[in-house]
């Protein structure tokens, strides 16, 4: 185990912004890394003028020497040189960086054409053990529920709808014994639970919230308006839009008969 831990500490994320885009620039940087015996694990562009690399080396001194040499280069500007975070690994893997709210660091923004990146991001969160409360905002039919299910599959987790409108309106009021497994991903539709759920259903939601497992709440703003929970209880908030200028509103949730009018039928297990 010591060897594995040691190797993990010697992975680094290196990202730079191109100042002078000339032929052979990437080759020069690769040669520099080679001379310092630093291996390139993965490389990708993460923006029009930025490139990211996942590096691996044996000693911290190699990174210190690299850093000092990079400071003398006028053709690039180092933007990140650090132990890799989840967002760094995904940036290299997908070729784009996950947008993060400048004021609220636990809020991450995605667009519909980034569903692959979103699924990968959530799958990595789902793999982590213990309690996690994730909220996901977005307009109807933008792909919220489908992304949660796909992420569960990628993380080899079983997903369980506590409340949902994916196919037909589902409102659970009890679970069977094995459904309480902390290996499950529990999916709650904040609008369905608070607008249509019985007291038995809401009690079940409270039980699930206490489990050391992953819970994903769609429409978290409506959920916290009508329960004892607050947005501070959420570990991550994800926003999914059709386009960057789309405003996420809840006007569609104001009609009390909205699901009946849409042709949904309700199940209570």
From Swiss-Prot:
One of this protein's Pfam families, by short name?
Answer: DUF3388
User: InterPro entries, per this entry?
Assistant: ACT-like_dom_sf, ACT_dom, DUF3388, UCP021288_ACT
Tell me the superkingdom of the source: Bacteria
Q: Please report the stretch or stretches of sequence annotated as the ACT domain.
A: 14-89
Q: What is this protein called?
A: Uncharacterized protein YmfK
Q: Where is the organism placed in the taxonomic lineage, from the top?
A: Bacteria, Bacillati, Bacillota, Bacilli, Bacillales
> Gene name, please?
ymfK
């Amino acid at each position: 185990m010591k060897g594995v831990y040691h190797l993990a500490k010697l992975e680094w994320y290196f990202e730079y912004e191109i100042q002078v885009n000339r032929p052979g620039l990437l080759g020069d940087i690769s040669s520099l890394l080679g001379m310092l015996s630093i291996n390139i694990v993965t490389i990708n562009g993460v923006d029009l003028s930025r490139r990211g690399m996942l590096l691996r080396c044996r000693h911290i001194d190699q990174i210190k020497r690299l850093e000092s040499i990079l400071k003398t280069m006028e053709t690039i500007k180092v933007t990140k040189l650090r132990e890799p975070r989840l967002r760094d690994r995904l940036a290299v893997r997908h070729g784009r960086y996950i947008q993060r709210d400048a004021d609220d660091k636990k809020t991450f923004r995605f667009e519909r054409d980034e569903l692959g990146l979103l699924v990968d991001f959530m799958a990595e969160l789902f793999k982590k053990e213990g309690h996690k409360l994730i909220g996901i905002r977005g307009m109807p039919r933008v792909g919220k529920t489908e992304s949660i299910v796909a992420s569960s599959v990628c993380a080899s987790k079983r997903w369980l709808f506590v409340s949902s409108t994916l196919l037909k309106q589902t409102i659970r009021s009890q679970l069977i014994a094995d459904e309480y497994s902390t290996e499950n991903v529990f999916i709650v539709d904040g609008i369905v639970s608070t607008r249509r759920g019985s007291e038995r259903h809401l009690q079940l939601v409270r039980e699930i919230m206490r489990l050391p497992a992953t819970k994903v709440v769609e429409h978290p703003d409506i959920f916290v308006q009508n329960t004892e929970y607050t947005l501070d209880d959420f570990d991550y908030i994800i926003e999914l839009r059709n386009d960057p200028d789309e405003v996420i509103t809840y006007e569609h949730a104001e009609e009390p008969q909205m699901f009946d009018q849409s042709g949904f039928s309700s199940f209570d297990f």
